[in-house]
A protein has these predicted regions:
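Glycine-rich Rossmann-fold phosphate-binding loop(s) that bind the pyrophosphate
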Residues: 9-10
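N-terminal Rossmann-fold NAD(P) dinucleotide-binding loop
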Residues: 13-14
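Conserved N-terminal Rossmann-fold NAD(P) cofactor-binding segment
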Residues: 34-71
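N-terminal Rossmann-like NAD(P) cofactor-binding module of classical short-chain dehydrogenase/reductase
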Residues: 73-76
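Conserved NAD(P)H cofactor-binding loop of Rossmann-fold oxidoreductase domains
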Residues: 79-81
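Rossmann-like NAD(P)(H) cofactor-binding subdomain of soluble oxidoreductases
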Residues: 88-154
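Substrate/ligand-engaging "lid" and interaction regions
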Residues: 154-184
Length: 184
């Protein structure tokens, strides 16, 4: 039995929860959000599609009830305000750092043994903040930027060259920021 919690029911968080449930990555997937009823509605949709998609993952939605996340093996944090057009990731630090601190406090309270994956922006800074705020060892806090950046890079390459996306290989190294990514 394994349990994964996704914090943040926006586009990234809901998609993440959906993919994990459909692929049966865990026996239980919990989606939690601050917005009343949002995660419950998304998980109800997911549950009702389970017969069509042929998966048996337990799916749970919760509004700010971190007790529902207790004993999670993995917690994926996608919560935070998104960038607006023309905004840099770094401009999100003030608001999203406060959100991250509150989330980490609840994650540690209810799932002190969890591995934490940070997907919120600015990802590098918030991953470091999660490490410091959690007190967990560094091998239990993961920033997800590199995989996402590499995937985006391969998509752009395929589109630019007209190649089949499954035949394109490439990766991005460096920080998940506007000036620190290096495509290879």
């Amino acid at each position: 039995m394994s349990k994964v919690t996704v914090v943040g029911a926006g586009a990234v968080g809901a998609t993440c929860a959906n993919v994990m449930a459909c692929r049966e990555v865990a026996s239980e997937v919990v989606l939690i959000d601050i917005k009343e009823g949002l995660s419950e509605g998304k998980m109800l949709d997911m549950y009702q599609c389970s017969t069509l998609m042929d998966f048996d993952t337990k799916v749970v939605g919760a509004t700010n009830d971190y007790k529902m996340t207790a004993n999670s093996d993995v917690v994926v944090i996608t919560s935070g305000i998104p960038r607006k057009p023309g905004m840099t990731r770094e401009e999100l630090i003030g608001t999203n750092a406060g959100i991250m601190k509150g989330v980490i406090e609840n994650v540690i309270k209810y799932s002190p043994r969890a591995i934490i994956i940070v997907v919120a922006n600015p990802m590098d800074t918030l991953t470091y903040l999660a490490l410091k705020a959690s007190g967990l060892p560094k091998n239990r806090i993961i920033g997800m930027g590199g995989a996402l950046d590499s995937s985006r890079f391969k998509c752009y390459l395929a589109k630019a060259t007209g190649a089949n996306i499954n035949n394109v290989d490439g990766m991005v190294i460096g920080g998940h920021g506007d000036t620190t990514m290096i495509p290879l």
